[in-house]
């Protein structure tokens, strides 16, 4: 059986005694499920970031520029980065991936969960949907090596009648995930 990207990332974090992990998109927003991401690495020292201040936010920053301006304070500072449902909201995800790669220690691992097929939603904008190959390419261009990628949450698109046959032949998934390593 294939290990999921999330399970792969959890294994990467479990071999470290007290990993430092950056949680991206930490601010709870109205209507969110508020999942406890810390359960994936309970022995870790978690640092949180978001583009807006909030009760769960340690660092207010934009992942496209965040850690480049702070005199290198966070360069190679994290053993892991956990980035759930954030990348689709970033105008330049390739810049954010490069920035996240700079934040990882050598040997550090990144987990991203974003959407392949999903309704439009804000906070504050909704820019992209991704395929598995797109995430792999973005990570590669940022200097990261893919350990595992995949889709989850099979779904259906209800197309107009003239496109009905297309939906039968094409797979759709709510989520696409990746675990990559520096």
Regions found by a protein language model. Give the residues of each.
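Core SAM-dependent methyltransferase catalytic element
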Residues: 159-182
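Residues that flank catalytic or metal-binding motifs in active/ligand-binding sites
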Residues: 124-126, 131, 172-176
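Conserved SAM-binding loop
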Residues: 19-121, 132-136, 178-180
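A generic structural micro-feature
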Residues: 40, 72-75, 127, 168-172
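Short alpha-helix
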Residues: 127-143, 148-150
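Core dinuclear metal-dependent hydrolase active-site scaffold
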Residues: 25, 156-159
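Class I SAM-dependent methyltransferase Rossmann-like catalytic core
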Residues: 1-16
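Active-site rim elements
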Residues: 121-125, 166-167
């Amino acid at each position: 059986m294939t290990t999921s990207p999330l399970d792969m990332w959890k294994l990467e974090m479990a071999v470290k005694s007290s990993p430092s992990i950056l949680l991206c998109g930490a601010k709870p927003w109205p209507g969110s499920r508020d999942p406890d991401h810390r359960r994936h690495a309970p022995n870790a020292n978690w640092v949180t970031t978001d583009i807006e201040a909030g009760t769960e936010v340690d660092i207010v920053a934009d992942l496209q520029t965040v850690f480049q301006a702070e005199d290198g304070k966070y360069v190679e500072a994290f053993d892991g980065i956990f980035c759930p449902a954030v990348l689709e909201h970033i105008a330049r995800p390739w810049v954010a991936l490069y920035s996240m790669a700079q934040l990882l220690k050598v040997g550090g691992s990144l987990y991203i969960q974003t959407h392949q097929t999903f309704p439009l939603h804000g906070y504050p904008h909704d820019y992209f949907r991704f395929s598995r190959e797109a995430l792999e390419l973005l990570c590669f261009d940022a200097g990261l090596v893919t350990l595992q990628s995949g889709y989850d949450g099979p779904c259906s698109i209800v197309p107009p009648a003239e496109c009905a046959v297309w939906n039968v032949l094409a797979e759709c998934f709510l989520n696409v995930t990746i675990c990559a390593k520096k």
